[in-house]
Amino acid sequence: MDRGIYRTVSTILTQVIVDPYDEAFYTPTKVLGRYMDVEEASAERKKGNYVVEEPGKGFRRIVAAPNPVSIVEIDAIKALLDADQVVIACGGGGIPVLEQDHRLKGASAVIEKDLTAGKMAEETDADSLIILTSVEKVKINMDRPEEEELREISVDQAKAYMEEGHFGKYNMYPKFRAAVEFLEKREGRSALITSFDKLDEALKG
């Protein structure tokens, strides 16, 4: 209300379908949960869970980060948007689920929130995708003499920078991937990656 917004806000607990044959399930990368001792880690392994050791700290679970296939509650999200409501959905990337015998079963995984955001923007046929992060502008050639801020680039340029490894696998890369996939689905779209503090300025160009 302080911002003069008087629309109804709805929050949806969101499930996101993932592919059980996604390669990510064979190479888990997402570390999560509390630290465990040797006995607890051994018990987790016996359950079939992956565990990784962090020297000097202990052991933690490590899970897959599969790609989002579709959003289960997308029709509800669309209905609320059509009713002119502000919708909060897909928090944390959504709850990963697998389709099994006409049922949904929870998956031991974490979905990249940026990819889920892109999937939701795609499935709601949004015109723009905005991803907020901690930096005002994305840079290439970080910490080098040729370091450069990116202001406006094409999809082809973004893909080239990704292939050259400018964004790191777990930091800026998922954001660029989400933006590229969103833009490639339909012409006339835009994607913006910036910080919350600079969002208004960025929207004005």
Residue ranges and their predicted role:
Residues 1-205:
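C-terminal catalytic "cap/lid" subdomain
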